[in-house]
Amino acid sequence: MNGDDLARELRDDHETEFSRLGSSKAMYALTGGDMDGDSVRAAAATDALAFAEVLEGWSGTDTTAALHSDLAAAARDYATAVDDDPSLDEEPLLYDELAGFDTAPARLGGLLGRYLVVSEYASQMVGFFVGDADPTAAADFRELRSELDAEHDRVVDTLDSACATANEWAAARDAAETVIDAAYDDYVGT
């Protein structure tokens, strides 16, 4: 097993969930039904701030502390890049789940699940701004999506070095599935 294999398996095993999380209905749910540019930006910023808070809340004692710190800083930068005045009004459900992991394999698996989910959201956000005839915002979100893809790759690489046993890979997989399921449950419940 390696991180790329795990990501592929998760995508295959959760094809329906990812299909729905990558739909315009998911964007509607993320924005609370307000389908305008400001609401899409606010939803992206809220997601990024919630993610940063989780990462900052994890103790610095495990071997992935530098990764957590880098990703938290990038998430805060992302929030301010997409919204002039980002705020964390209501935390998406997946971050409650993500915050509860306490081992490096579980945290990394949870991060992988989060990046798989947010990749779907980011694609919808690009599509929203293309459809809204806002090429500047669409280009900004494409660039941010590329940054998310690079962060995803970094998580995959870190998984490869952190998971040496079948039990560690199982913990990573379970955590990723928990995060994916939480995002999907949040979508269905909205």
What is the role of each PLM region?
Residues 2-190:
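Non-heme di-metal
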